[in-house]
A protein has these predicted regions:
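Charged catalytic cores and adjacent phosphate/nucleic-acid-binding surfaces used
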Residues: 74-166
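Extended substrate/RNA-proximal surfaces in nucleic-acid metabolism proteins
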Residues: 1-95
């Protein structure tokens, strides 16, 4: 795995924002207009699994279910359980590489149940990210994200910069 260190970045995140479709990388919100929402999520998870298994350049996986942020209302409520197999495949591969799962505070969609899957897969730690894009938004909904992480059995690390561990 790539190492962060002196003079370089503290942490290296891996994330996926677009999905291959018809020979091009396509944003999930565009794909939601072209195909059933569940198909978009399954394609996303398949590509995310390829990223996790095929690259050791990152330490933390961000945006575990990024397209969920754009889930169309017409598709009904988003249910993590409908994609449990896909979540578990990604989480198992991530844990096998001794990596960290990010919990995003911008829109903390992750549940204690999903973090339970992370634990069951062998995941040992989580990181918080705000995905703020504006300085004044850093840490929005942090308390909510902490509550979810604690409910899943993760606790603060040695200092405020450390990962939360089980």
């Amino acid at each position: 795995m790539a190492k962060a260190g002196p003079g370089g970045p503290d942490r290296i995140l891996g994330s996926l924002h677009a999905i291959p479709h018809e020979g091009r990388l396509t944003a999930a919100d565009d794909l939601f207009r072209r195909m059933p929402a569940a198909d978009v999520m399954r394609r996303y998870f398949a590509e995310l699994l390829r990223l996790v298994e095929g690259s050791d350049l990152f330490q933390i996986l961000a945006h575990l279910d990024f397209p969920r942020r754009m889930w169309p209302r017409a598709a009904g409520p988003y249910e993590e359980q409908a994609f449990e197999t896909e979540y578990r495949a990604v989480l198992t591969a991530l844990a096998a590489g001794d990596r960290i799962l990010e919990v995003n505070t911008k829109s903390p969609l992750v549940s204690a149940g999903l973090l339970g899957w992370w634990r069951e897969a062998g995941g040992r730690a989580v990181s918080f990210g705000s995905d703020a894009h504006q300085p004044w938004r850093v840490g929005d909904k942090f308390k909510l994200a902490v509550d979810v992480v604690e409910a899943a059995g993760f606790r603060p690390g040695r200092d405020r910069f450390d990962f939360w561990r089980r």
